[in-house]
Amino acid sequence: MTPTHVSLRSGVYADSVRLMQVSREIGARDGVSAVLVAMATPLNLELAAGMGLAPDGAAQPDQLLIALRATDDAELTAAVAAVEAALTAREDRGSAQAIPARTVGAALADAADPALAIVSVPGQYAVAEAADAIAAGRSVLVFSDGVPVEHEVALKRAAHEAGVLVMGPDCGTAIVSGVALGFANVVRRGPVGLVAASGTGAQQVSCLLDAAGVGVSHVLGVGGRDLSTAVGGLATLDALAALDEDPATERVLLVSKPPAPEVAERVQQAAAQLSTPVRSAALSPESPDLTAAVEALLGDLGVAVPEWPARPGAADAVPPGAVLKGFYSGGTLADEAMLIAAPALGDVRSNTPLRPELDLDTGQGTDLRATGHVVVDFGDDALTVGRAHPMIDPTLRLEAIAALAQSGEPAVLLLDVVLGHGADPDPAAALAPALQAAGLPVVVALVGTEADPQGWSRQADALAEAGAAVYASNAQATRYALDLIGEHA
């Protein structure tokens, strides 16, 4: 039997991205056959158990799990030592002055009159840091999730009174005066301002605009809950007002998942009072298509709609009776796929369902192996606790693809791959061989631009060589997947 090491550490917290990097570094060592270095959340414990590396006894989510399997005792000892070294390593910062600030207050004291603060700490600590920024008269982007909704409301009300903006919580995408923050793409500057209660929705829209030769002035993320009844569109209203005063913004597009109806009406009434024209790209059963919203905006601007980039795939491998399996990293893109697919397929189950009765939650977590038409948002908070976002770490989605292939269920696999700053530097490097090994008919919505670090065409070519049909438009990708299912039903 190969030797293993499984331990739990208390009083240790590390960022999920750093832990993913450590796992990759150790996993690349000769003699290491399995490794998981992660916070001991229920999802990560389930992954460890599937690897045969479950810890003995009870584990707590704030404990650090180190689980390893190696070819022999010497390799195991060396790997454990390498984990310890990687976790304790610090960059040579050169001087005490180079040590980064650990609070917003300290950062504001060090910086030369910043206009914007960024908060990316565990959710329970984010509120105090964001409040400090607001009190100092700065707008704040709260990347952190896990912030209670009542605290979100309090922060946004305080920001409104202070004349600043709260972007977030759980705001993963923004572009301010051409500066990309969080997950964002390299897009040209231009006259369109985006207000986005959706990160990947904003990325899809900004990338399609870029492909049409139209740039953006700003992308102001407001957090996925802002257009809920509980929050009431507080940040959306402030962001619309800010863009209305911006001379570089000639048109505004509001991007969101399905909003609460009464909040959508309130925002629509406020938008009608602005001097800058506002068009909505809020998803709903009646308006399920972000690409159509972009095309309508291009019409407003007098810009011809281009042929959206695509690569053909192998459609002849679709088995009879195939179902739709959507494995997404972006929540809004998953919603868009379900809204487009539901009229053709009927009920589509999901961990972020269109109706509560279609939820994949079993009471003990998300059923990632459910049969039938299924769309999974792997970026949902429940699947990212203690893990890096799937746009950074594809491990969980790759495991689901392999499990689907092994199940024998006939399916068309629909995926998103999101490029840009903050995302996996080469997603096709891991995904293409996984798709080839799975042997499934695959359709990919590839969200990005040629100027992104990963390069849209480079990624599209690699995925197409693996047999996938690739589309720049998620709506087009979804409809192509539905066509494949319909032709082989």
Residue ranges and their predicted role:
Residues M1-A489:
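Catalytic-core regions of core metabolic enzymes
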